């Protein structure tokens, strides 16, 4: 039976520290504030937005939501971004992805002020990670993976890590981050041939495919540590990861659950980044 790596325990520890830091900012009359930019009304985006706002309220972090039409002109979006960049009371900016197809993703990401880029979307902030500099903002989901492993005293040095995702949101930045911790990395994706033969040799497997219960026990060995990043919702609203949790937990050494796993840490790290930005800009 695997050890369950609960992310909510990690999140609670981070929040305890944030409470102290937010209290010190309040003494200086500084209230951390996040601006959320959402284009359209996709149910997943609205659910994520509500979760962020709820978590911010618990820590006395202010939020400001900009609800935008999906057909917003790029010029109008950039004007709004410039205004938020110049607002002293706004410390962090988060733009929900994916963007409408008519918007240039690189231009949008590059428009976020570097010191307010709390989910590391700006190419220059990402570039720092690819150069091995982990001192600035990191993408929240890859950082959540690192924080969970750190909390449970799982050393990355010398480990063979397989990441099943090659996106700029998870797979590519995470690969650079674990390299900085002296791990050996393999990135897999939808075109990878014989995926189980690769994952079975790994010490740690991180999956972010987005297909519920796709990954079964034959993908792992008895010493595998499994980090399931995905959150998939079935027709009844129940949450599942990529990994068939009930099937796999009987075989592997350790595994994150869904829910109460990576997602809870991801949201908490977003809050941490807002507080980081408020402290740096004060």
Curated annotation (Swiss-Prot):
It comes from the Bacteria. It comes from Clostridium botulinum (strain Loch Maree / Type A3). PANTHER family: C-1-TETRAHYDROFOLATE SYNTHASE, CYTOPLASMIC, C-1-TETRAHYDROFOLATE SYNTHASE, CYTOPLASMIC-RELATED. One of its GO terms (molecular function) is methenyltetrahydrofolate cyclohydrolase activity. Pfam families: THF_DHG_CYH (PF00763), THF_DHG_CYH_C (PF02882). NADP(+) binds at residues 165-167, 190, 231. Belongs to the tetrahydrofolate dehydrogenase/cyclohydrolase family. Pathway: One-carbon metabolism; tetrahydrofolate interconversion. This is Bifunctional protein FolD. Homodimer. Catalyzes the oxidation of 5,10-methylenetetrahydrofolate to 5,10-methenyltetrahydrofolate and then the hydrolysis of 5,10-methenyltetrahydrofolate to 10-formyltetrahydrofolate. GO terms for cellular component: cytosol. GO terms for biological process: L-histidine biosynthetic process; methionine biosynthetic process; purine nucleotide biosynthetic process; tetrahydrofolate interconversion.
